[in-house]
């Protein structure tokens, strides 16, 4: 029985080849949590468990297919050092699909939350990484230029942690200037939602741009900023397969 348990444990935490290649390509440390995990940052604690082997293999393929769309220079510009993959990831006890730990230059991603929807998990890869970009740029939550694009009567909520209800991330054309209910929760979430859906739901976003001048202006500002932040995120990127 002991031998069997050890064998199962080894299989449970084996690093999928696709994640190994991500680490090599982007010069980042990629880890899979292999025991109950806890890390405390400035005012918050992240906890996670070991993912099941089948969940890990499935997620690793999805994650790698999305991450490989980024130019190597973009990951360096974001100052990302580590990617940690786990299950049941929580931030101060609140379950999360992913968490950016800014002071640790680390991204955490959950293999199982939302795994009923591949498009959702794909979008999360980009949404949460964008927070890292925004933080490096110094405009995560205070962004007067972005806020000025909204209608005068528009007001954001008190943050994404306050909006965790099912369906908050569903695309809708019922909200002028934003893509989802979740985007209304905070300026940082508005930007991240737009970036994530540009990469995963490009046709939908372009359709909204034609009918909503605020969204069109936000896309223009977002792309312009990204091009200045990293020269590889340019028109050629957005017109390539990687950007679509």
Give the residues covered by each predicted segment.
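Non-catalytic architectural context of zinc metalloproteases
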Residues: 8-57, 157, 161-172, 188-190, ...
């Amino acid at each position: 029985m002991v031998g069997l348990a050890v064998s199962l444990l080894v299989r449970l935490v084996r690093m999928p080849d696709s994640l190994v290649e991500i680490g090599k390509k982007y010069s980042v440390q990629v880890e899979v949590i292999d025991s109950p995990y806890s890390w405390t940052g400035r005012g918050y604690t992240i906890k996670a468990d070991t993912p099941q082997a089948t969940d890990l293999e499935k997620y690793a393929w999805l994650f790698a297919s999305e991450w490989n769309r980024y130019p190597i220079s973009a990951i360096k510009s974001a100052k990302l050092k580590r990617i940690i993959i786990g299950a049941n990831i929580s931030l101060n006890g609140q379950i999360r699909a992913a968490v950016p730990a800014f002071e640790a230059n680390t991204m955490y991603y959950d293999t199982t939350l939302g795994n009923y929807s591949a498009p959702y998990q794909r979008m999360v890869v980009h949404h949460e990484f964008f927070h890292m970009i925004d933080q490096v740029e110094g405009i995560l939550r205070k962004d007067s230029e972005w806020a000025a694009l909204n209608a005068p009567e528009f007001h954001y909520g008190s943050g994404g942690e306050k909006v965790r209800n099912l369906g908050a991330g569903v695309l809708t054309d019922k909200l002028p200037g934003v893509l989802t209910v979740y985007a209304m929760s905070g300026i940082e979430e508005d930007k991240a939602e737009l970036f994530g859906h540009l990469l995963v739901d490009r046709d939908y976003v372009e359709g909204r741009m034609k009918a909503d001048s605020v969204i069109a202006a936000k896309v223009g500002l977002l792309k312009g900023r990204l091009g200045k932040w990293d020269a590889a995120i340019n028109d050629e990127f957005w017109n390539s397969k990687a950007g679509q």
